[in-house]
Swiss-Prot record:
Assembly behavior: Homohexameric ring arranged as a trimer of dimers.
EC number: 2.7.7.56
Annotated HAMAP family: RNase_PH
Signal peptide: none
Swiss-Prot/TrEMBL keywords: Nucleotidyltransferase, RNA-binding, rRNA processing, Transferase, tRNA processing, tRNA-binding
Known role: Phosphorolytic 3'-5' exoribonuclease that plays an important role in tRNA 3'-end maturation. Removes nucleotide residues following the 3'-CCA terminus of tRNAs; can also add nucleotides to the ends of RNA molecules by using nucleoside diphosphates as substrates, but this may not be physiologically important. Probably plays a role in initiation of 16S rRNA degradation (leading to ribosome degradation) during starvation.
Residues bound to phosphate: 90, 128-130
Species of provenance: Synechococcus sp. (strain CC9605)
Family: Belongs to the RNase PH family.
A GO term, aspect molecular function: tRNA binding
Catalytic function, reaction form: tRNA(n+1) + phosphate = tRNA(n) + a ribonucleoside 5'-diphosphate
Gene transcribed to yield this protein: rph
Protein name (record): Ribonuclease PH
GO aspect biological process, one term: rRNA catabolic process
Length: 247
């Protein structure tokens, strides 16, 4: 593989994440809400609680978590039409990914017969919307679970581990972390990696665009993703600590 450039078009090093920040509580009625910013990508993540579970889950004493994902009309250079009656395959794939990733770290017995509803609405899309949605939704979910314990709804938080996600890819034969749109749109390989706080993988989504990639290239991309995910989890913890100190 060719040597990585010292800097990318936005000035980042190949192994450098985009700037990460969180705006808390933009919605007054949700159990928790935030806007997560990764570079120019911004996603509104909110959590609501229903005191019931899907019909197939009733009587088991177990909870459930469901996620929805949408691109808002003005989130891209050309307006995105609202998906009303029928969801696109991409939207269905992404919201299932978000739900799977978060359910993996929820103790459904602690939740009881309740459903946590996660909504991820993309305000601005500059690539990495699914990974930003997972990373931001985990933060919103953490805040929601803490609130439910404080309110006496739950005895203890059902959240048992941390989750973050990041993209990696091959662009002009070079491995890059956290691709923006200018990179993602010309990547030969696009990989999304979801990881739990204990370092175990929750999901890997990888696609070759035009030509196959090797096992060694896959390993290089995973090796690039791992420290990036650790940094994102540290940023999640820092964001919550800063939020807690002013509330």
């Amino acid at each position: 593989m060719s040597q990585s450039p010292e800097h990318r078009t936005d000035g980042r090093r190949p192994e450098q994440l985009r700037p990460f920040s969180v705006t808390w509580n933009p919605m007054g009625f949700a159990l928790s809400s935030l806007v997560v910013h990764t570079g120019r990508t911004a996603v509104l993540c909110s959590v609501c609680l229903e005191g019931k579970v899907p019909r197939w889950r009733k009587g088991e004493g177990l909870g459930w978590l469901s996620a929805e994902y949408r691109l808002l009309p003005g989130s891209t250079p050309q307006r995105q039409s609202r998906e009303l009656m029928k969801l696109s395959g991409r939207t269905q794939e992404i919201q299932r990914l978000i739900g799977r990733s978060l359910r993996a770290v929820i103790d459904m017995e602690r939740l009881g017969e309740r459903t946590l509803l996660i909504d991820c609405d993309v305000i601005q899309a500059d690539a990495g919307t699914r990974t930003a949605s997972i990373t931001g939704a985990w933060l919103a979910l953490d805040q929601a679970c803490r609130s439910l314990v404080e309110q006496g709804v739950l005895e203890q938080s059902p959240l048992v581990d941390q989750v973050a996600a990041v993209s990696v890819g091959l662009v002009d034969g070079q491995a890059l972390l956290d691709l923006d749109y200018s990179e993602d749109s010309r990547a030969e390989v696009d990989l999304n990696v979801v990881q739990a706080g204990d370092g175990r993988l929750l999901e890997i989504q990888g696609t070759a665009e035009g030509a196959p990639f090797s096992r060694s290239q896959l390993n290089e991309l995973l090796d690039l993703a791992e420290p990036g995910l650790s940094s994102l989890m540290q940023a999640q913890r820092q964001a919550f600590t800063e939020h807690s100190s002013v509330t």
